[in-house]
């Protein structure tokens, strides 16, 4: 059993034209795997502020949080994350995403093709359970 203290993190589910915004993680946990943009909530920061900041840092895109989608808990090794995922919309519809911070790569992947890429553990099921993948 891990003795790691739970850390609060956020994720941003951003869909445009039936494509999901995903980043390839540059660092662990999940290095090399695709995930939605997100990360740890910093002290003094609201959940919505954390979503906006993480998307900006990892993709260069500006978003507005639309609604809470759901939460997951990820335990492994030295990590224990409680991740709260939010649907977010782009402030500028035609903005171009550019990988930054700990994102090695950024892409818009058609929702129906998500099963063909290496997603972080549990993400495909989460997106299916919450109606993003149908």
Q: What is the meaning of each model-derived region?
A:
Residues 12, 68, 86-88:
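A structural signal for short, well-ordered beta-strand segments
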Residues 72-95, 130:
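Active-site-adjacent beta-strand/loop module that shapes the phosphate/pyrophosphate-binding cleft
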Residues 19-57:
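Conserved Nudix-box catalytic region and its N-terminal flanking loop in Nudix hydrolases
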Residues 9, 35, 85, 107:
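Conserved beta-strand segments that form the floor/walls of ligand-binding pockets within enzyme
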């Amino acid at each position: 059993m891990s003795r790691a203290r739970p850390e609060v993190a956020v994720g941003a589910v951003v869909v445009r034209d039936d494509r999901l915004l995903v980043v390839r993680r540059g660092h662990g946990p999940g290095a090399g795997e695709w995930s939605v943009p997100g990360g740890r909530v910093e002290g003094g920061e609201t959940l919505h502020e954390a979503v906006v900041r993480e998307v900006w840092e990892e993709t260069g895109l500006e978003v507005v949080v639309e609604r809470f989608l759901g939460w997951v808990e990820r335990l492994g090794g030295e990590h224990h994350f409680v991740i709260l995922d939010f649907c977010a919309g782009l402030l500028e519809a035609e903005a171009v995403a550019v990988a930054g911070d700990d994102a090695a790569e950024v892409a818009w992947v058609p929702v129906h093709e998500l099963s063909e890429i290496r997603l972080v553990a549990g993400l495909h099921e989460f997106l299916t359970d919450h109606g993003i993948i149908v």
